[in-house]
Structure formats: C-alpha cells, structure tokens
Amino acid sequence: MQTGHKEKKIIPVLFEEMDGIWLHMQDSSHKRMKKQEMKVFTMYEGWDKDQQRRSTLVGKTMLAGMESSRLFHEKREALIEKKYDVDEIQQRILNGDGGSWIKETYDPDAIFQLDRYHVYQEILRKINDRSAQREARNLFEEGKTEELLEFLLVYADSVETTDEKDNRSRNARELYRYLNNNKAGLLPYRKQGKKIPEPREGIVYKNMGVQESQNCTVITMRMKHRRMRWSVKGASNMAKVLCS
C-alpha cells in the first residue's frame, strides 16, 4: 500500500455516493413529528478485481447523520482527509440523485453522475404509458441525452389536455425538469469525456450505484421497520453505530 504524509493512503480515484433516507420522527415526549431526512454517504476506492462476481467494494467507509447539509459535508470531508492524502487524489467521482444538498460538494472538479436507479424510478413514476416508458429508458441507456429531453417534451405536448385531473403532461414536464437540471450527470462517469486515472493493482472500476443497497442493508432494515420512530439525537447515534 502506498502512503503519503502522516501515513495517509494514496489513491488515484475516490468514488463517493450519497442519498437520503426519510425516517419517522418523534419529540422528547414521544409525540409523532414530521419525517426527516437522514443523509447517508459511502466512499470507496473501486471494486476487488478478484471478487468481481460479488462486486466487493475496496476501502468502503460510510457516514450517516441528521445534521444540516453544511455540517454533514464538513464531517464527510474530515472523514476523507483522515483516511486519504487528498492532495494525491487525482479524480473524485460523485453519484447521487441530484438533490441540492448532495451537489453541495467541496470539490468543483469532481465528476457528477446522476444515480441510474433514481432515473429509472422517476421514469416509472412520471410516465404511465409503457411504450413511452420504454422509449425513455432506451434513450437514457443509449446515452442520447438531447433526444431523451426532446422526447419528453414531445410526449408532454401529445398528452396535454384541459382535464385538470389528467396529470400526464404535468408529470412528464416534471421528469424533463429533473433530468435537464442534472443534464451534466446523465451520462455514466466513464462516458463524460474525462480521462480516469488507472486503478491500483487488484482494483477494477465498474458502474456506480451502490448507495441504495448500502442504505437497505446498513440503515433501512434497522431503522425503518416495525413502526419505529426516532428522535434526532437517537437517529444520529444509531447511524453512527451502524456505520462504524
């Protein structure tokens, strides 16, 4: 293993993924409160070359909490700096759903990729017509960004009606805005035209999108079932234990 100053690990690429999990909350008297979002972060160096069938992450580290986005990102950066020589990281790659707090990164040179799972999920939510769903998915998978956005506008126009209860056009335009606002991240990180440094020995680079499964196995199964409700402090403390 290569190390830099203060024995921090030297890596060429750092993969980062972030997502939010909405939890049922309660106050100090156990009275039900509005749901609040727990922020979850996973970083890793790549995938184990010898465990490709299992897609084992190398150097996986997680962080989760109920803090404000500013404080959460400060903790995230501190976690990265504690483990790695950040001056030697040549490329950071961020995968997320496009939420405003997720894109508040400290590194303007990081590559942003819109999470594929969330794109597919939004297509299914916003478009009911199966043939239109299929066309949107195909255009997305083929990396035809402009054609996808144009298709959504044409589809929205084609189903527009004066019936206020018919929300097909409105939903399609919402999907268009979501994708257009995250246009720079619609292509996978390896197809965005930036040269990615070669992986270290024993590591391979694959498609990102591990956060949903990490959420499920680490947080969701422990904190969202059996009608659980949490205080902010309790949720943060439990997240710290689960991510340790």
Where are these predicted regions, by residue range?
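Catalytic center-proximal scaffold of phosphoryl-transfer enzymes
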Residues: 1-244
